[in-house]
């Protein structure tokens, strides 16, 4: 069984070539490369890869605008942002645009390919440094109040359970096992949760869970 198909978008020739070799050597198929965001969008529409590895700072169209365009097309393609810049503003802009994950270019090759598989499977992926800052930011805040945050009150009790599991980074398989339901049931709940909360990806759900205080570091 072959790995996910991948499109690499980066404005540096050496980076594109290096990523292509790393990915191909570990069982994934690179179906195309793009030197800028506009070309990445065009090739994604044409080739419909499983995953786009997207740099943020590129000419013509940056990676955030390209991500937003790809997500708006409602293709099955997932976007994994891979960048040198571990800056909060860029990261949150990328996640808001609909990226399914975020990793730094310094990520070890095996971890990068693991991340490609994770995102291709529809799961959320955040670089450890971003996850740590997200936790640190919200642990310093007092809990706003007890109970269900207002934005989450559109969810049923069961959907809140599933949402909490998503926020802890658990896969559909793990959620199904924890809640003693089928994977198909979990998938249905996840799709309904994202639709009700107007979210595009699971990674946006993780961020929202911390922002609303539903999930607190070290707690439930």
Which stretches of residues belong to each language-model region?
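Active-site residues of response regulator receiver
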Residues: 10, 55, 83
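The feature encodes the CheY-like receiver
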Residues: 15, 33, 54, 59
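Acidic catalytic/metal-coordinating carboxylates
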Residues: 36-39, 60-65
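Short amphipathic alpha-helix used as the core "switch/output" element in two-component signaling
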Residues: 42, 64-76
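Active-site beta3 strand of CheY-like receiver
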Residues: 47-53
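Short, flexible helix-to-coil linker/hinge segments that flank and couple to helix-turn-helix
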Residues: 90-96, 101, 106-157, 161, ...
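Recognition helix of helix-turn-helix DNA-binding domains
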Residues: 169-204
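Basic, Lys/Arg-enriched C-terminal extension of HTH/homeodomain DNA-binding domains
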Residues: 194-220
């Amino acid at each position: 069984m072959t790995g996910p198909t991948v499109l690499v978008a980066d404005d540096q020739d050496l980076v594109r070539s290096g990523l292509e070799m790393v990915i191909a050597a570990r069982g994934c198929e690179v179906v195309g490369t793009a030197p800028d965001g506009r070309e990445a969008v065009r090739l994604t529409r044409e080739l419909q890869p499983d995953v786009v590895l997207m740099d943020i700072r590129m000419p013509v169209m940056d990676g955030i605008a390209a991500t937003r365009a790809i997500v708006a097309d409602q293709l099955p393609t997932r976007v994994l942002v891979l960048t040198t810049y571990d800056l909060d503003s860029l990261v949150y802009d990328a996640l808001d645009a609909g990226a399914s994950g975020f990793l730094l270019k310094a990520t070890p090759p095996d971890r990068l390919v693991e991340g490609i598989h994770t995102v291709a499977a529809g799961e959320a992926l955040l670089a450890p440094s971003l996850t740590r800052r997200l936790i640190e930011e919200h642990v310093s805040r007092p809990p706003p109040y007890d109970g269900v945050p207002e934005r989450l009150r559109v969810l049923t009790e069961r959907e809140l359970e599933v949402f909490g599991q998503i926020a802890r980074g658990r896969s559909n398989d793990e959620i199904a096992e924890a809640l003693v339901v089928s994977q198909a049931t979990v998938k249905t709940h996840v799709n309904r949760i994202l639709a009700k909360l107007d979210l595009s990806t699971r990674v946006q759900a993780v961020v929202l869970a911390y922002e609303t205080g539903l999930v607190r570091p070290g707690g439930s």
